[in-house]
Amino acid sequence: MRDGDPNRRLQVTLGIQFDEAGDLPKLLKSYCVQNGQFAMQISPYLAKLNTGNDAATVLSPSQRFRDLLRNAGADPVMQRLQKEMFKATSWDPALRWAKARKFALPLSFLIVADSFLQSNQMLSRLTQRVRVALPVTSQADEKNWVTGYTKIRNAWLKAAGGAMAASSYRTECYLRLIARGDWDLTSDVVMNGNRIPLREA
């Protein structure tokens, strides 16, 4: 995929968070250090991660490397490391950002967390365009801010074109939840055709 790389070149991605231009090298180095099941096979590829030219990384055409990542995905060591890195790089910073601005609604936290997951931050060029003061002083202000931000982010993604525009299914999903008034996330989330249960049966 080209998504996530500043030069829009082809690169290897793992899951929804890890790519060669981002945290994939760090994840795989940690996996090898902790002697994951496929560490010995993956280790020789570490030096080649995020190398190449403006069109593609060296590893993007490697079916062998992609197969190794798929196999490693079933390893409990890899699963644990992914959860730990997601918590450290996306979830925890998102919670701090939202709480500092007095957000309290589950959907607000989800939307902020998704922004950190995709952009590693709440982009100031988007947040500064929302016409509601922060920190919010009421639940109504919170809803208005999050609604305005999500609409702005949705338009920004669509205008970007390519893989960024294709990722607007995320913001479209959140706008549907907002339109339904499901700020407490009482129902399943349907994103990009996939149903994600948020409550235990």
What are these regions (language model features)?
Residues M1-I111, D184, M191, P197-E200:
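Acidic, aromatic-lined catalytic clefts of primarily extracellular/periplasmic carbohydrate-active enzymes
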Residues L28, F38-Q41, R96, M122-T127, ...:
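Generic marker of "main functional regions" within proteins
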Residues P93, A98-L110, F116-L126, D141, ...:
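Long, repeat-rich segments with strong aromatic
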Residues R131-A201:
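Low-complexity, Gly/Ser/Thr/Pro-rich intrinsically disordered linker/tail segments
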Residues R9-E20, M122-W145:
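Short secondary-structure subsegments characteristic of cysteine-rich extracellular domains
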Residues V33, F86-R96, A113-Q121, R131, ...:
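Sec-exported extracytoplasmic/periplasmic mature domains
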